[in-house]
Swiss-Prot record:
Disulfide bonds: none annotated. This is Secretoglobin family 1C member 1. GO terms for cellular component: extracellular region. Belongs to the secretoglobin family. It holds the Pfam family Uteroglobin. PANTHER family: SECRETOGLOBIN FAMILY 1 MEMBER, SECRETOGLOBIN FAMILY 1C MEMBER 1-RELATED. Its main location: secreted. InterPro entries: Secretoglobin, Secretoglobin_1C-like, Secretoglobin_sf. It is found in: Secreted. It comes from the Eukaryota. Keywords: Secreted, Signal.
Length: 95
């Protein structure tokens, strides 16, 4: 549990840093980031969502560890997170 909290803190910190550093739609960035964490690969994070940032090796290692934790979730739990993401994305489209 302690490791999970640390990984969540890393993800939130990364999100906050990127959110402050960009002028793009922050919600869109965050949703793309979450979607890639749930169903993408670490490489897709660096090439896509985080592509315009210089991600150092320690941050890459942290992201890989976070992705590994997400990939280790029970399939039904991961599916529920994906459904929640789809629901949130759908509500943003209608707004």
């Amino acid at each position: 549990m302690k490791g999970s909290r640390a990984l969540l803190l890393v993800a939130l910190t990364l999100f906050c840093i990127c959110r402050m550093a960009t002028g793009e739609d922050n919600d869109e960035f965050f949703m793309d980031f979450l979607q890639t964490l749930l169903v993408g690969t670490p490489e897709e994070l660096y090439e896509g969502t985080l592509g315009k940032y210089n991600v150092n090796e320690d941050a890459k290692a942290a992201m890989t560890e976070l992705k590994s934790c997400i990939d280790g979730l029970q399939p039904m739990h991961k599916a529920e997170l994906v459904k929640l993401l789809v629901q949130v994305l759908g509500s943003q489209d209608g707004a």
